[in-house]
A protein has these predicted regions:
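PRPP-associated nucleotide enzymes
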Residues: 1-292
Length: 292
């Protein structure tokens, strides 16, 4: 570990930052984040970072305030003469808005990355991007990490085999990620053709694959409102599955997600700690694996 490395955390996921520092056997840097009476953020590094290699850890959920906080921390680091600044974004908010899918809309993920690079980020690190092609939006190194390595030990304990196990992709977008899990586990692969009548609403159109008498593993990059993954679980059980386990890297868990998951046909929900989970979103089926 370089002696010139310093790690700092925003407010979004300090627990993960502390775990990373414990793993690396370094102290988490001193960064003061407070608010003025009108709600404006006040950012100040409480230690010298001149000529240091600075890493800033900040997930962006909820996105608006945490993205602004990240940009202000980045600007403060550059103005404090850090040698390099690496932005570590375990969960990249606005990652789903990666193209113009209808007239008169922004490409929001490009806007966020333009701000990040414009303020001087030297490198960006993120995990299980919803759309990996957004790496091409910037001309600085953009490292795309995968949670699969952290989750694989847990999956091995579940004894999936070629005869009884199948990985089910809940939509076409998650097919590549699901196929990687299926290959690693040596089990078969199935796919759901999902349609979206409107935002945050998904319906199952078709299911391709044999799920009869199988233990089903549903893989996705995130659980937002949980509609997609719960519909996939219903489809799996309707097609003869004997159990359903859901795995997602990012526990966004917005709106009705927790209630849906608690009352779903899913036996276990495994997520990572890329987003800090508040106490009101903890439920019996939930298991959290650290990616630190």
């Amino acid at each position: 570990l370089s002696p010139s490395m310093k790690i700092f955390s925003g407010n979004s996921n300090r627990q993960l930052a502390e775990k990373i520092c414990n793993y690396l056997d370094v102290d988490l840097g001193k960064l003061n984040i407070s608010q003025f009476s009108d709600g404006e953020l006040s950012i100040a590094f409480d230690e010298n970072i001149r000529n240091e290699n600075v890493f800033i850890i900040q997930s962006t959920n909820p996105p608006a305030e945490n993205i602004l906080e990240l940009m202000l921390i980045l600007d403060a680091a550059k103005r404090a003469s850090a040698k390099t600044v690496t932005i570590v974004i375990p969960y990249f908010g606005y990652g789903r808005q990666d193209r113009k899918d209808r007239p008169r809309v922004p490409i929001s993920s490009r806007v966020i990355l333009d701000m990040t690079v414009g303020l001087g980020a030297d490198r960006i690190v993120s995990m299980d991007l919803h759309s990996s092609q957004i790496q091409g939006f910037v001309n600085v190194p953009f490292d795309h990490l995968y949670s699969r390595m952290a989750l694989f030990d847990e999956l091995k304990k579940m004894n999936f085999d070629e005869e009884t196990g199948v990985v089910l992709a809940p939509d076409v977008g998650s097919a590549k990620m699901s196929q990687a899990y299926a290959k690693s586990l040596g089990i078969s692969f199935a796919l759901i053709d999902k349609r979206r009548p409107k935002a945050n609403q998904a319906v199952v159109a078709n299911l391709v694959g044999d799920l009869k008498s199988k233990k089903v593993l549903i893989i996705d990059d995130m659980i937002d409102t949980a509609g997609t993954i719960c519909n996939a679980a219903d489809a799996a059980m309707d097609n003869g599955a004997i159990s359903v386990t859901a795995i997602a890297t990012h526990p966004v868990l917005s709106g009705p997600a927790v209630d849906r998951l608690m009352n779903s046909k899913i036996d276990k929900v495994i997520v990572c700690d890329t987003i800090e989970i508040t106490d009101d979103k903890i439920f019996d089926k939930l298991e959290v694996i650290s990616v630190a």
